[in-house]
Amino acid sequence: GDICHKHNLKFIVDAAQTAGSFPINMEQMHIDVLAFTGHKSLLGPQGIGGFLVSDEVAHEMIPLVTGGTGSVSDSEFQPEFMPDKFESGTQNIPGIYGLHAALCYLEETGIENIHAHEMELCKAFIEKIDALQNEKIRLVGVRDMNKRGPVVSFDFIGEDNAEVSFKLDSEYGISTRCGMHCAPNAHKTLETYPQGTVRFAFGFKNTMEDVDYAVQAIQKILQK
């Protein structure tokens, strides 16, 4: 944030993978815009998301979508006040209520507690995979737990990553996300393009037994 502001740039954070599992303070981190989805670590339903903006950005930004808001209906122009300025059309009320219930649970549980548990599982998972000493397994990302989140991506050398992901699901009941994760240029930089990676994401309800089961499943698949 500091670097962006020194160059008169806005600092925009995509918190799709971190909101709900990582403590975020927009003011301390100098974040101008924070975009999030509700269905991942925020534990809400699909089809709901949002963005938090600073007062400055809220004033300067021009809405991409305009239309009826249910307020200032006698005007042909978009309202300038928040949140109506960016909320045209009928809102996803069931999604909003679902996300609200999820946020209440997260607040009661504590983001710090969730983050600590998920990172403990992440650390154990990486260590146990490393212990296999299998040259086919390439961790994509850093091992420093202070510089990563509880999402782990692997590139299985010499294997079809999509096939590995399919077998994890069909044979072991383990859901992963395979592919380029809406970031093809990132995968080009990481040299995982065009196959992408197999991504594991740990949640608060996962256990150490789940970690052991996933490691064993990977080991068995690569032995076949």
Question: For each predicted feature, which ranges?
Answer:
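Pyridoxal 5′-phosphate
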Residues: G1-K224
